[in-house]
Structures are given as C-alpha cells and as structure tokens.
Amino acid sequence: MIDSLESKITFEIPNNLDFNKFIRENNYSSFWQNLHQQETAARVAAMSSLGMGVSEPLRTSEYNASDFNLLSSLQNFAGRAGPVGFSADGSEQLLDPTYERFIGDVWVGIVLTLMILSSIFCMCSCFLYHKFRQWQRSVLTARSQTLSSMDLETPPPYDVESLPSYTIVSGLPSYNDAIEQLKQKQQQKSPGGHLEPVKLQRPSVIKLFESQSQDLLAGAKLEEIRYNFANNLTTSVVSENSFDVTPTTSSNTAVNATTVAVAPNFKTQVSTSMPKKFTVCNYSVENERSGS
C-alpha cells in the first residue's frame, strides 16, 4: 500500500505582491541585520561545537558585494524605483561600493584631463609669445643696421619697444625721416655745412590723372600749312557747300596759315598744324568741288 502512494513535491512561485509585502513589512536595514545575525549565530555555534574560541570581529561581520547584489536584485524584482540613496518609502537604499568606486574614478579622470589640457594651452601660449618677441627683436636689429649703414648720428624719433609699423617691416623710412636724411646729406655735401634744404612735396594721386593739354597748348604758337590740291596752281576755290573739318586747337593759340598749291588732278585739301614748342600735329580735311 505504501508503494502505491506517489511522492509529490509542490513548490509555489511567489509573485510581485508577496515581495512587496515582505519589503514593506521589513525594511532593508532590519532585514540585513537579521540576516547577518543569523549567519553569525550559525558560525559561532559551529565553531563552539568544534571547541574553538570565537573572536569579537567574527561576531560583527561587514557587508560584501554578494549581499549588495542580492538586495539589488530583490529591489529590481519588486519594482520599487526611488531616488539615489533613499527608497520610495523613505528608508535608506544600499548601493554597490564597486559602482561608487567607478564613479569616483571617472570624476578623477575628468579633472586630470582638464588639468593636462590647460597646461598644454599655457605651454603653447608661452611658446608663441617667445617667437613673437624673437621676431620683434630681429626686426629691430635689422632696422638699426639699416640706419647705421646710412651714417646717421641720431636715432629715429620713435620708441624702440613699440610694435613694428609698415615702415619698419618694409625697411623704408617714413616721410619725415626721409626729409631729415635728405637735409643731413645736403649739409654733409656742402662746404660750409649750411645749405638751404630742398622742399619736398608729396605727389597727389588726383593730379596724375588730370588732363593738362590745355595748359600745355595755352602759351604755344602754332603754324598752319594748308595743302590745296586743285586745278589752278595759284589759287584755290572752295564752294559754298564744301565740308570743312577745323583743326582742334585752343582758342588762345595764335595760328599762321599758309596755302601751298601743288599739281592738279587732286580735289582734296589737307590742313596740318605744326607747333613750334610742342610736338602736336593736327589735321583738317576739306572736301571741295571744282567750280564750273
């Protein structure tokens, strides 16, 4: 009859409600203390049965990583999400020390990276400033050598420590320095040492593009020679309907006209103007018809 009985083992799987009820009734701290007290009592009883003494540090054991993992899995299974450090009901929440150590290492790495970058930036800034000062000293040295080669007794009237201007970079003196150099050269060349300096005037850009043809031809006296190609060798007859192109001369210019008769068979009159003082040549063409 006993053999006819079947042996059965029943296991009931707990659900979330059971875990929530268990966690609400017993908070983490009390549950943790009870768990370690039971483990400590079991160890003390085992060691006492073997006849070994129990030390005080064994009675007060500390938390380890497996305990934290167990509590974290229980909390995740129960679905109780709360802020860091405290649970939803206000009880203290236990954190994994490995995670805290990892966060601390991350912050230390960030701070060290920022310090290294700032030191590299300072080194680059100092290097660029050193190169700038070296370039400035080389430019000033070249400038002083240029001035000494020109046999000048006095230094130029500008501050040596000032930033280089376009005259220092190009190696050319400024306008005032050029005038002073010209005066000194003239005084050195003169026998008495006292010579009136020449007055220099800057050229105007606008005057370079102005037309000066009227000013050049104003005081000139032009001679005009007309070549008359007609049938008559002595006189020239111009009809009333003839087309005349006058020479382009100034109104203030005095012109002497001379008519020269050449061989017949030509009916075109050419007028040229030859200047006395300037190489200006003007041409005028007249078409004439022979009279009947």
UniProtKB/Swiss-Prot annotation:
Effect of gene knockout: RNAi-mediated knockdown results in thinning or even complete loss of commissural axons in embryonic nerve cords.
* UniProt keyword Transmembrane helix, yes or no: yes
Provide the primary localization.
membrane
Q: What keywords appear on the UniProt entry?
A: Cell membrane, Membrane, Transmembrane, Transmembrane helix
Q: Where is this motif: PY-motif 1?
A: 163-166
One GO cellular component term noted in the UniProt record for this chain: plasma membrane
A biological process (GO) of this protein is: axon guidance
Span-the-membrane segments of this chain are 102-122
Xref: Pfam families: Comm
| Subcellular compartments | Cell membrane
Membrane topology label:
Single-pass membrane protein
Output this protein's name: Protein commissureless 2 homolog
